[in-house]
Amino acid sequence: MLSLRTPGFQGESVQFSPLVENKIAVAAVTHYGLGGSGRLYIHDVTPKGIQVCQHYDVEDSLFGVRWSQNCENQVYACCGDGSLRLFDLTMPSKPIHKWKEHKAEIVAIDTNTVDRRIVVTGSWDGTIKLWLGNLPNSVQTLNNGSNSRILTVATHYSSPNLLGYTSSDGLCKFWDFRSSDKFMSIEIPNQITCMNWSKSNHRMVYTADNNNLVYCYDIANLKTPLSVLSGHQLAVRSIKSSNSAHDLLATASYDMTSRIFDPEQHSCIRKVDLHSEFVRDVDWSDFGDGSWIASVGWDESLYIWNAF
């Protein structure tokens, strides 16, 4: 297990680089995102531990981070002032691009592994925007309603056109970029807090709710989950699928734990309680045997640990 403290900055989002084995990015906030500034950290993961490679300070909170799928030196971060920013690690002073179309905080971001130009952002203004590369403006906007804040967004791992997202109306919905509107949704009695796709089975989608449960669905039948996974004591904040042929799920929860679930066994196979505050995000590394996981939380700590 490796760890690094980020004094004064609480972790909100973490992602291993998909292109460089030893790089990891963290988006962090001050004052728990209720005001103040943000910081983008770029770390090197070495045999001696996690080393701070560089960081970028911004004037508002940073709620999400995603590496570019095209350039190993570029990182997108979404900001509390409604802006999307692109940083280049070879230019350490400030972002090389800044887009500002959202009317409220951007709290969710994802990139697409099929069409590597695609970046998607979700905001508390109730909209999701689709961006392509470095074009000066977004190319599509989905309006989910001004009274419904977007919570999470996730592009499909094998389709360049499919997006899943959750919002404060409690639903998980799906959007095909070739259409101007959402086309189906998951509705359960409890509020859905986050979602993600399987990396190995293109039909599988995972959600979690404020009743502390994780649900596994076949997208062809969203009325009945294939599996319901229990273990967390408070709501799940983030779900990520492993890269292995046998899907495993890593979760981050407000109960201050991360857990590993096996949907086929319908069970939690590991509980990790390294953090002393809310765990805000987790991510699996694409490299090696795919067993390394990073987690960040409001305890101002980054941990990298083995799933097994």
Curated annotation (Swiss-Prot):
Coiled coil: none
SMART domains on file: WD40
GO terms for MF: peroxisome matrix targeting signal-2 binding
Intervals holding WD repeats: 57-88, 101-132, 145-176, 187-218, 231-262, 274-306
UniProt-listed InterPro entries: PEX7, WD40/YVTN_repeat-like_dom_sf, WD40_repeat_CS, WD40_repeat_dom_sf, WD40_rpt
Similarity section: Belongs to the WD repeat peroxin-7 family.
Protein's recorded name: Peroxisomal targeting signal 2 receptor
Organism: Schizosaccharomyces pombe (strain 972 / ATCC 24843) (Fission yeast)
Gene: pex7
